[in-house]
Design a protein with these regions (language model features):
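Peripheral, non-transmembrane regulatory/ligand-interaction domains of membrane transport proteins
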Residues: 1-159
Length: 159
């Protein structure tokens, strides 16, 4: 799924088509199909194989700096069921015109941005947006660690 978001006069708008994407837009890809990857490739000149790299479940966190883009991969926490925790890679591309996120599944880390709950979030402030995503990732990890700690304490008390 490919969605395009952009701040206009302080309001976050979701554009209906990728053709509406303009400078300062955020392109969010969730489990993209080959056609969506090709569209993003045409818009940004990011090679398709690099876009696909972010979809590799074994991809480790790293940063790549190229002439036309910066590619950041971070592992984000995922809760599967009531007590099964995992981490999946989230790829973030920063180009001159666009901010692109790509993940195999819906990322809880991005919900506050998609629902416009972050008061200081703007799609065109790409560095700030990157740091805000990293901060939200840390907050989620801490929340999940606290849940694990509470469950561990409960189990230890029962023993």
């Amino acid at each position: 799924m490919l969605t395009v978001h952009k701040h206009v006069e302080g309001e976050l708008f979701t554009d209906s088509t990728v053709q509406d994407a303009t400078k300062g837009s955020w392109i969010n890809l969730v489990n993209p199909d080959p056609d969506e990857l090709a569209i993003v490739n045409m818009m940004t000149q990011i090679p398709t194989d690099v876009l696909k790299a972010a979809l590799d479940t074994e991809e480790r966190s790293h940063v790549e700096i190229e002439d036309e883009y910066i590619f950041v991969v971070i592992n984000i926490p995922v809760l599967r069921g009531s007590d099964v925790y995992d981490a999946v890679p989230l790829g973030i591309f920063v180009t001159e015109d666009f901010f692109i996120t790509i993940c195999l599944e819906e990322a809880e880390v991005l919900y506050p941005f998609l629902s416009n709950q972050m008061p200081t979030f703007y799609t065109f402030k790409k560095t700030r947006f990157l740091f805000q995503i990293m901060y939200r990732t840390a907050v989620l990890y801490l929340r999940y660690l606290q849940q694990i700690d509470r469950r561990t304490d409960d189990i230890e008390k029962k023993l």
